Each structure stands twice: as C-alpha cells, then as structure tokens.
Amino acid sequence: MSSVFPGPRFLSLLQQNSKTLIQAKQIHAQLVINGCHDNSLFGKLIGHYCSKPSTESSSKLAHLLVFPRFGHPDKFLFNTLLKCSKPEDSIRIFANYASKSSLLYLNERTFVFVLGACARSASSSALRVGRIVHGMVKKLGFLYESELIGTTLLHFYAKNGDLRYARKVFDEMPERTSVTWNAMIGGYCSHKDKGNHNARKAMVLFRRFSCCGSGVRPTDTTMVCVLSAISQTGLLEIGSLVHGYIEKLGFTPEVDVFIGTALVDMYSKCGCLNNAFSVFELMKVKNVFTWTSMATGLALNGRGNETPNLLNRMAESGIKPNEITFTSLLSAYRHIGLVEEGIELFKSMKTRFGVTPVIEHYGCIVDLLGKAGRIQEAYQFILAMPIKPDAILLRSLCNACSIYGETVMGEEIGKALLEIEREDEKLSGSECEDYVALSNVLAHKGKWVEVEKLRKEMKERRIKTRPGYSFV
C-alpha cells in the first residue's frame, strides 16, 4: 500500500474486494496507522471479520473495533457487531456487555438485533436471554413505543414455541402493522399440534384481521400463512372461500408463485386434487416447491404411480428436484404405506436425478419398511447405509421390532439407542420414547428385572413418562 493515506471511497472499494482475513487485517492496520475514524468503514470491516470462519483472531479484531480501551463502545459499531455475528456470539456479546454497563446506553436497534439472534439461535440459553431482554425493553419504555421491537419480540417468542407469550405481546401492542399480524398468524401456523388447535387459532386471528384490522390490509404473506393453516385442518369449504378472497385482493395464483404453490398444497391436503391440478396448470411460473407440492399431493391422494411422470416433467421444465422434494414425497409414501413405490423413488434419487440421499431419506425408508413388518429388510438397509444412523432412525426400527415381536433385534437396537442418549448430556425430549420402546421389547421377552432397572434409571435422570405412552 502507498504511504499516502487513501480516501474513504478507495478504502471502501478495497474492503469490498478483500477476500481473505490477511487482506482485511492490512486494511485494518492502515485505518489505525492513519488515524481514520470512519464508522461506515469500520462497520464494513466488522462485517468482513464476522463473515469469516470463526477464529479467535477475527473475533478479537472485530472486538477491537467496537470496544475502546476506556468508555462505552460506539452504538453503531456495537449494533453492527451484534447484527453480523453468529446468533450465539451475539447473545454472548450482549450478555457480557449488559452485565457490566448501563442499559441506558443501548438503543432500539440493539434490542432488535439481540432478540433476532435469540430467535435464530439453537442455544438452550436463547429463551432465557430473550426473556431478560423483554424485561429490559419494558423497563426502558421501548416496548410500547417501538413497533419494531414489539414485532421482533413477538417473533422471538413464536420461534421458540412460546405462543402464549407471543400472543400476550401481540394483544398488548397499541398499533399493529401487516408485519405484526403476519408474525402472529405465522407463529401459530409454524407450530403444528395434535388437534390442530394452533392452526385454528391462526384462522380465527385472520378473520379478525380481515374484518377489523384498523385499515391494515392482508398481504400475500398473510394469505400463504392462512392457506397453510387450512392445509393442516383439511377444511376444504373454508379453503375455497379463502381462495375467492385472495382473488378479490388481487393476488392471482397465475403470476404469484407463492400464492399459487400454497393453493396447490391446500387443495391437495384437503383431498381436492382436481382443484390442485387446475391451479397448478394455470400457474405461469413454478418453482421447486410448486412441483414438490403437486407431486406430494398425488402421493397423499393415492395416485403415487403418477409421481414419476410429474418428476420427469419437472426435470424437463429445467427445475431439478432437490432434497426437500424427496423428503416430502418419501414422507407421503410412508404415510400411506406405498413400500415398493417408496423404495423405487429412493433408488431413483441418485441414479436419475443426481440427488444424494441424506439421513432424513434413509429414515423414511426404514420407517416405511418397519411399519410394513419387513424388519429384517429394514435392518439390512441400515447396515448398508454409507452414513451413521441417528437416534430417530434407530427409534423407528426399535418401535417396529416391539410391534412385530422381533425381540432379539429390538433389544439390541434399543440398548444402542439408549447409549446414544446417555452420551448426550442434554435432554433432547425424546428419551421417554426410547426408554418405553426398549422396555416394551424387554417385557415381551419377560425380562422384568431389566424393565425395573430402566424405570429406576428414568427416575434418576428425571425423565417422566408422557401420557399415552405404554410402559408395560
């Protein structure tokens, strides 16, 4: 680099073109040497550091830009760090700062970014930190002043499955935009439950929105969420009425691929395949999800033999089936017990469509074979797998062994499954099923002493039997 300090525009261009951590460090060094304090450049540099694979070096350099030796960090740079970091890192950075500094220094965007991180994080601490942030924004008066914070908070609770608190935040908001309504309706739709209570709540809330939304108009996102709720409940009559309402709003499925795909999915899952096909054929633009919805609809409605032809049409149109396509189709075949068709489809994934099967696809085949009583075939299929079977797959076969009396194999698989669970320090929520599956197999063999040992271990690990699960 030249010893003459380049202007901000030149540095900005160089920043955009820097591909490696070394180049970013060189730019960083020039900024420090020449006393540059341009926050927009620092912000880009932070984004660059955070985009690189997580290393101690890049993390420290990003922190150096944000946290001075004395005093508070710059708000813009602090928020940029929260926004650009991985969710778990954002939560840790915020928690560390909030524990040592005044909350009054934080602004609206700080809370939006950290709540967004809590919504995206898979960490067990995300829900706890999010609740703490909820208390902070309420204490500072941001909650009812900022529609953005309210909506982000609602989204956070919905993503974490706490729909009761999400609804509480929604009901307390003084004003609601279409984004707010969509977040709450979408939250209900994305958490399927036994009896479809959440889907019904979504439909009731949509009716309230369409009738008295205080001048706020439903968007295409709203309608996609509502169609998803109808798909879950199977209420065809309401689905047809909503289709008419969609046309009235001006969202035409012929050109709106998201609305069109949602309609295809809704009609298919409500058992009205003719209407699904009508919408499908009218659509001028189709994406991979459109084709997947139509193919899955065929399988679910007993016309799985037509699926291969539709997949060929899909490939000829220039759209290649992907992992999601085959997961959806194999799940449908599993649901209605199309064993041979499922096996043929699985074989065609790699040979005809070039899609490498992943654990979910293998799991569908094992479950399909297990439910059909073809236990030995399922076991041999697992042994031939090029990837290690997971707990879900083993649990499926263990349950099948219990149902069909394959006690020797069931005991072997059940014990292997419990070993996986014992090695995992965190409770995943599925341990009850594993203990029950193994205990049922042992009970069939009359090994009551071992059944009692399992019960004792469950007590020690504080694993409770769920209502509806057999524990012989």
UniProtKB/Swiss-Prot annotation:
PANTHER family found in the cross-reference section: PENTACOTRIPEPTIDE-REPEAT REGION OF PRORP DOMAIN-CONTAINING PROTEIN (PTHR47926:SF537), PENTATRICOPEPTIDE REPEAT-CONTAINING PROTEIN (PTHR47926)
Domain of life: Eukaryota
Ranges where the record places region Type E motif: 393-472
GO biological process, one term: mitochondrial mRNA modification
Keyword field: Repeat
Keyword Nucleus: no
Name used for this protein in its record: Pentatricopeptide repeat-containing protein At3g18970
Ranges: PPR repeats: 107-139, 146-180, 181-216, 219-253, 256-286, 287-321, 322-352, 358-388
Keyword Repeat: yes
Organism the protein comes from: Arabidopsis thaliana (Mouse-ear cress)
Protein family according to the UniProt entry: Belongs to the PPR family. PCMP-E subfamily.
Pfam families documented for this protein: E_motif (PF20431), PPR (PF01535), PPR_2 (PF13041)
InterPro entries cross-referenced by the UniProt entry: E_motif, Pentatricopeptide_rpt, PPR_At4g14850-like_plant, TPR-like_helical_dom_sf
Cellular component GO terms, alphabetical: mitochondrion
MF GO annotations: RNA binding
